[in-house]
Swiss-Prot record:
Role according to the record: Promotes RNA polymerase assembly. Latches the N- and C-terminal regions of the beta' subunit thereby facilitating its interaction with the beta and alpha subunits.
SMART domains according to UniProt: RNA_pol_Rpb6
Highest classification ranks of the organism: Bacteria, Bacillati, Actinomycetota, Actinomycetes, Bifidobacteriales
Class of the enzyme per the UniProt entry, highest EC level: transferase
Species of provenance: Bifidobacterium animalis subsp. lactis (strain AD011)
Keyword list, A-Z: DNA-directed RNA polymerase, Nucleotidyltransferase, Transcription, Transferase
EC number: 2.7.7.6
GO BP annotations listed: DNA-templated transcription
Annotated signal sequence range: none
Quaternary structure annotation from Swiss-Prot or TrEMBL: The RNAP catalytic core consists of 2 alpha, 1 beta, 1 beta' and 1 omega subunit. When a sigma factor is associated with the core the holoenzyme is formed, which can initiate transcription.
Pfam families hit by this protein: RNA_pol_Rpb6
Descriptive protein name: DNA-directed RNA polymerase subunit omega
Similarity field: Belongs to the RNA polymerase subunit omega family.
A Gene Ontology cellular-component term: DNA-directed RNA polymerase complex
């Protein structure tokens, strides 16, 4: 059993926010992008329990207790998703 600190410390966000920002125009766009994907992943897990499969599941390996938002961040970081703005996104806040 090892004690002490990790050689490469991990922060609260893994992958780091700086890496994720390479895939979005702004931190706000990243938050919306990740939240929408996390909702899709959450719906997938709910539908899986009900025997329905209408959403696409996680595109990366995940742990059983991992949060949908963490999975979405890893998908974004690995370049598995592409951010596109729809009409609803363009009209929000205007």
């Amino acid at each position: 059993m090892a004690f002490g600190t990790e050689p490469i410390p991990t922060g609260l966000a893994d992958p780091p926010i700086d890496d994720l920002m390479e895939h979005a125009d702004s931190k706000y766009a990243l938050a919306i992008f990740a939240a929408k994907r996390a909702r899709q992943i959450n719906s997938y897990f709910t539908q899986l329990n009900e025997g329905l499969l209408q959403n696409v599941g996680p595109l990366v390996e995940y742990k059983s207790q991992e949060k949908p938002l963490s999975i979405a961040f890893r998908e974004i970081n690995e370049g598995l998703l592409e951010e596109t703005l729809g009409e609803d996104d363009l009209s929000e806040g205007n």
